[in-house]
Amino acid sequence: MKSKAAEDATVARREVTIVNELGLHARPAAEFARRARAFRSEVWLVREGKRFSAASLIEILRANLDQGATATLEAKGRDAEAAVEKLSRLLESFKDGK
């Protein structure tokens, strides 16, 4: 069994590509931030060496994620792997300009 410190230190990462034809604009970014806040782990989008809090709509919009842009979805904490898995699937579901 992992110690609490080991669980809190769990880090998960996944490269993601934005598929929405309008990019990660306000509506999907707001949904993404809302879902990211549901996890106990801290979650970030990392792009071009900069980290943006996935729990903040403003931070997500600052990342300027247009269609085809790539970023690393990174989470640290006890549910990091679940956060990365579920949030990466959510990003893939934002299609057709919605």
Q: What are the language-model segments listed below?
A:
Residues 3-4, 17, 23:
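Proteins with a high burden of low-complexity, intrinsically disordered sequence enriched in S/T/G/P/A and R
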